[in-house]
């Protein structure tokens, strides 16, 4: 919305907001005036233009403070001054900015609550306001859409007692329809954007934006308090209240969808108890409790039924315990972990947990604390950056994580929102034809200080239609499992009917295309790899990983009849006579990457360094030992204010021992030597150099696909070495083409490359390097 703050003669402030939304701020400048902006403009029509008018009737019924909006056409008025072109003769909403009087914004209110435990807010009023958001599907309730009125500001009581006031009802009654927006975008891309539908399909995301006070002690409502508030809220929303709310809309809106809105409100009201029960269970699975910067006493004790009671009290300046700040019992069947953040006060924590299995983490601060551990069923994980704290009782039940870095005690809210995402891959090349892959990725977020996730697992299955080959790929990543090291597990099955070119070992291997055709050199075999690793990230630009791996090989001779791979005299590999025998290997692999590029897409400066080591130890009589070391260094630099970008990559590797035919180093194709078939040359050593020049021609202000258009030239050179099958010739490919980077996000390029073996076209998304 375009907003303007107004002041009337009494000094009271009003907010004037356009009903029609402006989408320029939502997209990059290069997308302004394109179909993307038109799509967003059309999407804003999903918002009901008059939804704010419905709120007062509902809010009055459930005791939620509210503004008193009116909607009309802004008349011509000189008082608008320079803003007149934005507002005159437009439909706009006008409402008081602070309905109850002077109030604080959310950052100030949250800061006051953190600084002083004498300042508080009304958690049940906050719960009612959030339930009203759910009723009308107002999902965008971030911090800036709340005001906080101090109920004590006109009294002699200096302590603040905040009443939450929701405002800006832009997203209420939003309708999401269609396969892309409802079934794809809302489900997987942005599930927070909930629509005004019958029932409440995803309460966890309906309340996502307003979760910023979940960790406050006052917000730790018991289940009894929670359900009572929900029950009272629903009982007050009678059909007559809902009908009155609908009839607050203009007559044209009532005639168009009044009955539908009424029935949807009924459905959502009736679904609230079950939805809020689900949300209560959701937020109480792993609980944050964030105490203030003043002095507090925390008493944690188990109950007879293995629950865990947490009581927090204020400690005054004289060191005496005064008022209670929270007192809640967490059931072990529901709550798995409590994370207690102590902040800056001179706090004391007394633990008397004889039976509860609930995991307890305590995060201290630079201020010394006092810990009294009478008993604890399990180890207490304590994080501190001071060594001055006092430990009494069974201190051995504490597992201390000490670090002077302030990050060790920083408040990091738990992320409860695990996600899964469907995956789709597609591609085309001359050997495999069109390929298609489907899969899914699951991301688990709930770990303590695990970023960017706790663990992630993904599985894809792809097939190449020309060859009938399949590829099944699994990858799992667990963050900071062994100290600072991540665990990564990669499993790849190129089966059944994996296809790979093989022309024999040597720099002078023949490709008799006219005599045999390309299919003759395609080998069908199955490969299975399992590779667990430990990965370290010592800096933002450096990654290092190492771990064991296992590999299995199988080739069916009936699927390779009349093909090159069954011609042992031409293969020149140690396994030429055992190609059809199953093989198994185990070994160690390691990789290192260092990335100092200034950006990921078409970088103009920086280096990208990668290196990999793979060892293979044979596990049966047909499997021999070998090891492979490979790497590459890519440099980027530019001229004429990035009008020309040069990218140069030099790479190579060596193999020692007795590799199988597919374990050699390969040169050829899109990856490192254009102008030749994939896997064209196999050798024990390899070196190559790729250089590309990308010349920017024009920034295209296209309506449909804006982006950067340019020409590119490339030159590839390389060779392999193989004992007994070598020559001094370097293979070369030279070519050029065009590129187009769509919206600075998706590079596309088409090049034609010539070598001694002919012309080869290449089209792909993304640059090679």
Model segments located where?
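Conserved ATP-binding subdomain of kinase catalytic cores across diverse folds
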Residues: 1-110, 137-138, 160-207, 329-330
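Outer-membrane beta-barrel initiation region
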Residues: 177, 351-352, 363-482, 577-604, ...
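Repeated loop/turn-to-beta-strand initiation elements of outer-membrane beta-barrel proteins
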Residues: 445-450, 482-487, 540-544, 554, ...
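Transmembrane beta-strands of outer-membrane beta-barrel pores
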Residues: 428-432, 442-444, 461-467, 480, ...
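Membrane-embedded beta-strand positions of outer-membrane beta-barrel proteins
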Residues: 424, 438, 457-461, 487-491, ...
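C-terminal catalytic region of ATP-dependent kinase domains
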Residues: 44-45, 150-327, 332-339, 345, ...
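C-terminal outer-membrane beta-barrel translocator/porin domains of Gram-negative envelope proteins
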Residues: 415-416, 473, 502-504, 513-521, ...
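Outer-membrane beta-barrel "beta-signal"
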Residues: 589-590, 738, 758-769
């Amino acid at each position: 919305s375009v907003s303007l703050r107004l002041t009337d003669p009494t000094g009271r402030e009003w907010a004037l907001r356009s009903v029609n939304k402006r989408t320029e701020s939502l997209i990059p400048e290069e997308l302004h005036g394109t179909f993307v902006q038109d799509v967003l403009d059309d999407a804003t029509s999903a918002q009901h233009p008059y939804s704010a008018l419905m709120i007062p009737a509902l809010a009055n019924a459930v005791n939620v403070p509210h503004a008193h909006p009116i909607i009309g056409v802004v008349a011509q008025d000189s008082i608008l001054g320079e803003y007149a072109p934005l507002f005159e003769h437009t439909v706009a909403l006008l409402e008081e900015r602070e309905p109850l009087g002077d109030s604080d914004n959310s950052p100030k209110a949250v800061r006051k609550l953190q600084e002083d435990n004498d300042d508080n807010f009304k958690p049940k009023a906050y719960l009612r306001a959030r339930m009203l958001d759910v009723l009308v599907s107002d999902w965008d309730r971030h911090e800036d859409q709340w005001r906080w009125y101090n109920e004590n500001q006109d009294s002699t009581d200096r302590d603040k007692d905040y009443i939450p006031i929701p405002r800006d009802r832009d997203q209420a009654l939003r309708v999401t329809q269609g396969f892309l927006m409802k079934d794809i975008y809302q489900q997987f891309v942005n599930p927070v954007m909930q629509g005004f539908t019958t029932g409440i399909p995803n309460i966890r995301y309906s309340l996502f934006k307003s979760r910023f006070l979940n960790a406050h002690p006052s917000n730790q409502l018991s289940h009894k308090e929670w359900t009572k508030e929900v029950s009272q809220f629903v009982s007050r929303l009678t059909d007559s209240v809902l009908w009155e709310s609908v009839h607050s809309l203009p007559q044209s809106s009532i005639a168009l969808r009044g009955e539908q809105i009424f029935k949807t409100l009924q459905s959502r009201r009736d679904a609230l108890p079950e939805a809020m029960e689900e949300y209560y269970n959701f937020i109480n699975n792993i609980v944050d409790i964030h105490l203030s910067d003043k002095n507090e006493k925390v008493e944690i004790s188990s109950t007879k039924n293995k629950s865990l009671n947490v009581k927090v009290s204020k400690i005054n300046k004289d060191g005496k315990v005064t008022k209670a700040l929270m007192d809640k019992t967490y059931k072990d069947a529901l709550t798995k972990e409590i994370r207690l953040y102590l902040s800056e006060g001179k706090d004391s924590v007394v633990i008397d947990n004889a039976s509860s299995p609930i995991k307890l983490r305590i995060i201290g601060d630079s201020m010394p604390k006092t810990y009294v551990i009478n008993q604890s069923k399990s180890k207490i994980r304590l994080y501190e950056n001071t060594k001055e704290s006092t430990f009494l009782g069974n201190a051995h039940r504490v597992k201390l994580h000490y670090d002077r870095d302030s990050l060790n005690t920083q408040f990091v809210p738990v992320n409860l929102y695990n996600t899964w995402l469907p995956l789709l891959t597609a591609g085309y090349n001359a050997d495999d034809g069109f390929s298609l892959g489907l899969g899914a990725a699951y991301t688990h977020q709930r770990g303590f200080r695990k970023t960017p996730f706790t663990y992630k697992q993904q599985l894809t299955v792809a097939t190449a239609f020309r060859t009938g080959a399949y590829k099944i790929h699994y990858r799992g990543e667990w963050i900071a499992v062994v100290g600072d090291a991540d665990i990564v597990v990669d499993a790849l099955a190129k089966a059944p009917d994996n296809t790979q070119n093989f022309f024999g070992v040597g720099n002078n291997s023949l490709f008799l295309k006219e005599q045999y055709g390309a299919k003759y050199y395609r080998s069908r075999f199955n490969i299975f790899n399992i590779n667990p690793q430990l990965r370290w990230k010592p800096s933002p630009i450096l990654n290092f990983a190492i771990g064991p791996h296992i590999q299995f090989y199988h080739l069916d001779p009936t699927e390779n009849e009349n093909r090159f791979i069954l011609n042992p005299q031409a293969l020149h590999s140690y396994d030429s006579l055992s190609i059809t025998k199953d093989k198994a290997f185990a070994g160690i692999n390691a990789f290192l990457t260092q990335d100092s590029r200034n950006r990921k897409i078409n970088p103009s400066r920086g280096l990208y360094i990668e290196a990999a080591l793979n060892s293979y130890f044979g596990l049966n009589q047909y499997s021999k030992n070998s090891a492979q070391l490979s790497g590459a260094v890519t440099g980027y630099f530019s001229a004429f204010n990035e009008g020309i970008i040069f990218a140069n990559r030099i790479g190579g590797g060596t193999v020692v021992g007795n590799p199988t035919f597919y374990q050699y180093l390969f040169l050829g194709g899109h990856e490192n030597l254009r102008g030749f078939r994939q896997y064209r040359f196999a050798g024990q050593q390899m070196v190559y150099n790729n250089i590309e020049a990308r010349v920017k021609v024009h920034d295209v202000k296209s309506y449909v696909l804006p982006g950067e258009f340019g020409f590119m030239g490339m030159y590839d050179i390389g060779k392999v070495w193989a004992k007994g099958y070598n020559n001094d010739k370097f293979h070369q490919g030279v070519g050029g083409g065009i590129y187009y980077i769509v919206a600075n996000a998706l590079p596309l390029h088409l090049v034609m490359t010539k070598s001694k073996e002919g012309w080869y076209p290449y089209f792909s998304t993304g640059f090679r390097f």
